[in-house]
From Swiss-Prot:
NCBIfam families: glycerol_kin, PRK00047.1. Keywords: ATP-binding, Glycerol metabolism, Kinase, Nucleotide-binding, Transferase. Glycerol binds at R82, E83, Y134, D243, Q244. This is Glycerol kinase. Pathway: Polyol metabolism; glycerol degradation via glycerol kinase pathway; sn-glycerol 3-phosphate from glycerol: step 1/1. It comes from Clostridium botulinum (strain Loch Maree / Type A3). Gene3D superfamilies: 3.30.420.40. Belongs to the FGGY kinase family. Homotetramer and homodimer (in equilibrium). It catalyses: glycerol + ATP = sn-glycerol 3-phosphate + ADP + H(+). ATP binds at T12, T13, S14, T265, G308, Q312, G409. GO terms for cellular component: cytosol.
Amino acid sequence: MEKYIMSLDQGTTSSRCIIFNKKGEVVSVAQKEFTQIYPKAGWVEHDPLEIWGKQAGVAGEALNIARISPEQIAGIGITNQRETTVVWNKRTGMPVYNAIVWQCRRTAGYCDELREKGIDKTIKEKTGLMLDAYFSATKIKWILDNVEGARELAEKGDLLFGNIDTWLIWNMTKGKIHVTDYTNASRTMLFNIHELKWDEELLEILDIPKSMLPEVKPSSCVYGETDEILFGVSIPISGDAGDQQAALFGQTCFNAGMAKNTYGTGCFLLMNTGEKAVDSKNGLLTTIAVGIDGKVEYALEGSIFIGGAVIQWLRDELRMVKTAQETEKYATEVEDNNGVYLVPAFVGIGAPYWDSYARGTILGLTRGAKKEHIIRAALESMAYQTHDVLKAMEEDSGIELKALKVDGGACQNNFLMQFQSDILGVEVDRPEVVETTALGAAYLAGLAVGYWKDRNEISQNWAISRSFAPAMEDEKKEKLIKGWHKAVTKAMDWEERE
């Protein structure tokens, strides 16, 4: 009986299930979008019950599409939107509030208060993260402080916290297992990435009971088995990693200095730094890349909040395009950006600037500016932001990048990939299998159950679909980058501080 690995890929806008074979090829995909909830400006939420329902639904669907039985699944890997925070009652299994999404800025003011007390230095030292509303810690605190009765329940030991991976595993095992992996834990702003444990001092500062937190385990190990009610059989849940770390693993960036960029809702650039946690002097995050083979490996990460989301905005709010694919056609219908720059700081701006008060701007408009120029400027913004992060990474790590591996939806846009290569001045490699996030989770799950032997076997699966080489003169490139940096300064510190 041929065996497969199932990957549950729980993203920011959709829940997906992808089934892979031994060669790391996609056998089937099922996907369902779910509701984005915006209660106030800058606030973003999801319904955890809807996420669980849709995730369970696509798992069954993917099996049907592949025409295989649950018995043929050797293991399940989970990858998830990171930082998004769920708090639920362990007795009833019901969330006490909606999931607060990583993009949500509601705790920015509280982060400012902590910064004034100098807590940001402690946080960076212990967790490798910047003090920011992006991470889970202040979201948990917000729920405890603002949801009626939540703090009392938490003090009694009745509330559990989890990122989406933990929430899914808890539901898949019918409440038997409350666990996360090193990569997800490293994004909470509560986990000491050097000592590999929840940090008592940070829990005290934020007033979060330790009893709420899941057990932290490696990214590749058997956490437990699915309850039979789900598939009719028990299947090992054997891999777990946050989406960006899973993509780094799926891109087989196993050695220090190897890097990938995922062009999803946000853009995420990660560079493997091996067993050394490199402290960033340039506004990047030091994070755990993977916990495997009895050790952890670290990465530098630059988080760009708005990547592909700028295309959704062109499509849904401005109605300039009907589909994301059309952006490539429009961008290539004009020779250049005509001096137009779009800074998509809709929810502030991430690495290496970290300004919660920046807002989106379109600059350099003249009477000759057309829809095509704005669309082109939107695509170019992803490449410029990636450039800024990469330069910071090279400076921190002392490693000059030779090539960049790419994945995520927008990496299918050939105009963007060529422009990215031009602006970076390095080769950009798009792999055959672009489902690298789900693939990384599958690899982690498969290694834990012996489906794949080791990382060498996995590396042989990676193949280039298309390579983009830089073709822009340096002078033109420098001029464009200079214009971009000028535009970013105009977007910063726009929103009034309360």
